[in-house]
Amino acid sequence: MAAASNSVQEAIDRRYMAAALRLSRKNLGRTATNPSVGTLIVRDDGAGPMIVGSGVTAIGGRPHAEAEALAGAGELARGATAYVTLEPCAHHGRTPPCAHALANAGITRVVGAASDPDPRVSGKGYAILRAAGVEVVEKVLAEEANAQLAGYLIRSLSKRPEVTLKLALSSDGKIGRRGQGQVTITGEIARREVQMMRAEADAILIGIGTALEDDPALTVRLPGLENRSPARIVLDRDLRLPETAKLVADVDRVPLHIAVGEGVDPQRKAAFERRGVRFIATDTHDGAIALPELMEDLAALGMATVLVEGGAVTAG
């Protein structure tokens, strides 16, 4: 009977953790420098489990998901279970540690998915909970959580963002026709998927060749998600991007970063800066922007996921 009971509880834990992971996707790409985390507060008063509080990391990274969920649950959090997609924080920052908040609210059981590699947290969040007498169950749907949090985990461990290359090829292995601007290769379903990838990324990166050839805006165009456009990054060692480019036209709405090398015309750079364009001065290697160093710079800016949509030179 005990084994059956454990099996039932494991199924319940997986079901609510899956729901918490779906919730955490809501603000992917909008919570830097923090990851987008989902939290559910679930209690069972004898009639079956019921969600009494939910939270996702707010835009900008604060408040944390746990605080939002506890605020929604109120007194119903006492004696309840919290499902968290990432180990609760254990350090004092702009807000008190979420591990303490969960324990102080009377949560009696915490089910976690991914462990936090941040040395300020790593294992300490769960230790605080256990010391307070809270039952802790770790690594429920950990593989799924790690995949969703890959950008944050990679940035924490390797000091660089997760990089995803989007590349469309024709049946003969071509990505476009030189001098003919944008060429449509993919179908509607693939284009919509790319829009979702953009909406969940911290930044989109292209080379100056693509910027000059296609004059893209690199914004999210799915209805209802237009405000989810991530920062745009252009690899432009010599600052050849025209001030009339679409990327510059809407810089007041969507950030634009240009990675340049040394020796850029200061007056031309100042003109872009007056428009609101931000510059990343980075090293060059063999005449091109040094990507490893640039990735470190982007991670330092809090970017955890970068979608590369450049052409053959950048992709290579």
Model regions: which residues?
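Short loop/turn microsegments at loop-to-beta-strand junctions
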Residues: 35-37, 52, 163-165
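Active-site ligand-binding patch in enzyme domains
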Residues: 154-158, 162-171, 175-304, 313
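Short, compositionally biased leader-like segments
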Residues: 1-19, 127-144
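Zn2+-dependent cytidine deaminase-like catalytic core
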Residues: 40-144, 231, 257
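Residue-level signal for inorganic ion chemistry
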Residues: 20, 38, 89, 129, ...
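Short, structured interface segments
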Residues: 139-156
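Short, basic/aromatic recognition patches
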Residues: 12-32, 155
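Short acidic/polar active-site loop segments enriched in Thr and Asp
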Residues: 108, 304, 309
